[in-house]
């Protein structure tokens, strides 16, 4: 099985692309995947007292090496596309160290003003949405969406990490 990654700006067509790709019987494309979260949680065990009492890095690294193969063991597809923030610094570090295939990330982009406009349009049509629970008008909503740590900036940072020369 070949595993690829899908990431990108929100409102850039990730869901549409996933839907199209899943029409091919050889491709299994996930919704937002938990596998990178599993990587993070297992890796962070290295900071816990129980691990530090007997720090067997080699064995825990073996577990990290096997997360992707074991997670997708029963997926009957030639190609699996794992959708998630593969471009964050910490996720890239873990993938480079423990993912035993060539890392290929499909990263969808869309002009930033279109992303913001799409969010605002969605928020206007969606009662009790998270954007208008935190803000009072479209201008505040745009500032909120662009805030460091929120989804747009996280993905912009991912793109920046992916474009850095090695």
Labelled PLM ranges:
Residues 70-73, 97:
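A general structural signal for short secondary-structure junctions and capping/turn motifs
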Residues 1-67, 74:
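PAPS-dependent sulfotransferase catalytic core
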Residues 25, 72-75, 160, 164:
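Secondary-structure transition/hinge residues
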Residues 79-166:
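PAPS-dependent sulfotransferase catalytic domain
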Residues 66-68, 147-148:
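Electropositive, surface-exposed helix/loop patches at the edges of structured domains
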């Amino acid at each position: 099985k070949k595993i690829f990654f899908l990431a990108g700006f929100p409102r850039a067509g990730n869901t549409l692309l996933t839907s199209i790709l899943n029409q091919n019987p050889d491709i299994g494309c996930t919704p937002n995947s938990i596998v990178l979260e599993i990587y993070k949680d297992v890796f962070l065990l290295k900071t816990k007292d129980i691990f530090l009492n007997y720090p067997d890095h080699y064995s825990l690294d073996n577990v990290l090496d096997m997360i992707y193969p074991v997670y997708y063991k029963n997926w009957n597809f030639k190609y699996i596309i794992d959708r998630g923030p593969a471009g964050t610094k910490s996720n890239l570090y873990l993938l480079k160290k423990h993912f035993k295939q060539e890392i290929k990330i499909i990263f969808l982009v869309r002009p930033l003003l279109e992303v913001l406009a799409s969010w605002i349009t969605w928020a206007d049509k969606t009662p009790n949405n998270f954007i208008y629970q935190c803000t009072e008008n479209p201008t505040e909503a745009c500032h909120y969406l662009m805030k460091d740590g929120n989804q747009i900036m996280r993905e912009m940072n991912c793109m920046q990490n992916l474009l850095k020369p090695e």
